[in-house]
From Swiss-Prot:
<keyword id="KW-1003">Cell membrane</keyword>
<feature type="transmembrane region" description="Helical">
    <location>
        <begin position="347"/>
        <end position="367"/>
    </location>
</feature>
<dbReference type="Pfam" id="PF08495">
    <property type="entry name" value="FIST"/>
</dbReference>
<protein>
    <recommendedName>
        <fullName>Uncharacterized protein Mb0644c</fullName>
    </recommendedName>
</protein>
<dbReference type="Pfam" id="PF10442">
    <property type="entry name" value="FIST_C"/>
</dbReference>
<keyword id="KW-1133">Transmembrane helix</keyword>
<keyword id="KW-0472">Membrane</keyword>
<keyword id="KW-0812">Transmembrane</keyword>
<dbReference type="InterPro" id="IPR013702">
    <property type="entry name" value="FIST_domain_N"/>
</dbReference>
<dbReference type="InterPro" id="IPR019494">
    <property type="entry name" value="FIST_C"/>
</dbReference>
<dbReference type="GO" id="GO:0005886">
    <property type="term" value="C:plasma membrane"/>
</dbReference>
<dbReference type="InterPro" id="IPR016741">
    <property type="entry name" value="UCP018953"/>
</dbReference>
<feature type="transmembrane region" description="Helical">
    <location>
        <begin position="49"/>
        <end position="69"/>
    </location>
</feature>
<comment type="similarity">
    <text>To M.tuberculosis Rv0874c.</text>
</comment>
Amino acid sequence: MRIGVGVSTAPDVRRAAAEAAAHAREELAGGTPALAVLLGSRSHTDQAVDLLAAVQASVEPAALIGCVAQGIVAGRHELENEPAVAVWLASGPPAETFHLDFVRTGSGALITGYRFDRTAHDLHLLLPDPYSFPSNLLIEHLNTDLPGTTVVGGVVSGGRRRGDTRLFRDRDVLTSGLVGVRLPGAHSVSVVSQGCRPIGEPYIVTGADGAVITELGGRPPLHRLREIVLGMAPDEQELVSRGLQIGIVVDEHLAVPGQGDFLIRGLLGADPTTGAIGIGEVVEVGATVQFQVRDAAAADKDLRLAVERAAAELPGPPVGGLLFTCNGRGRRMFGVTDHDASTIEDLLGGIPLAGFFAAGEIGPVAGHNALHGFTASMALFVD
């Protein structure tokens, strides 16, 4: 497998497409593109048809997916607020693209358009429209009915309202649903960095009702949280007031859960009378949870740990990657541009990397597919 990436910031969409495609072909070094991922910035929304046509004419890939997004990633750069086009090309086994729709029926709803193979544990890349496709329902279905299916991707961030989204699948431009691709035979590892660090100690959930936790270790959650905060330095207490989260241990067989073992969810509310807290996930009695904080320093450290751990799991050096980073990260979180992309490139030696700023990030935690927020999710490929 060979991977090449090209990028252009030319304001003219056809010129940008031609330049990005040509650079990607050069990096592919003569390989035949089995898959193209086409990414354009939001300023190219109205020219999406021309953008796709120009890249198809230049590259003629066997399969193509992509989108228009709020900002894109190419190499070590994150292009947040400027016209840009990135083309990511990969040689290798044939890829299978698909388009999913969410259809309401008299008795409920259906996800139509593609049937995931129960026997194939191939990587699937997913790019859903946030306005017409419920990503959480698909992920719940995969976890429940098709365990072992791995999905990585990002909720497309380019549109401000229903119908604004632009999705690319082969030669079609779509405005709803989900586009994806199955990569049979691709050797990859998933990287998920949720940007948090734990505070206090892990607790067993001893009381819960759906997504409301009523007891942690026999006491109200707010009481447990107060105990933690009182033992923290003033600057740490400020983090709790601004970025408090909770982590749910995915694999309960772990004796000492660490980085990458928690599914991070936000605190949605609290009842000061009972001390109960509401979180963004249904939790069962017996689960292990730990309070977490999120800030730039924690996010930087977590990303480095996640990338280093993933690189150690690869059977060889990585040949490229696709990055889906939250549109709440970037300059908003770190105060500087290019943080996630440049950190990954520094750690992995300048691999061909592309991606976009997402409105929700998809990736597995401890083998459990999940939809995240404020996260960097990446697929790393090896030859």
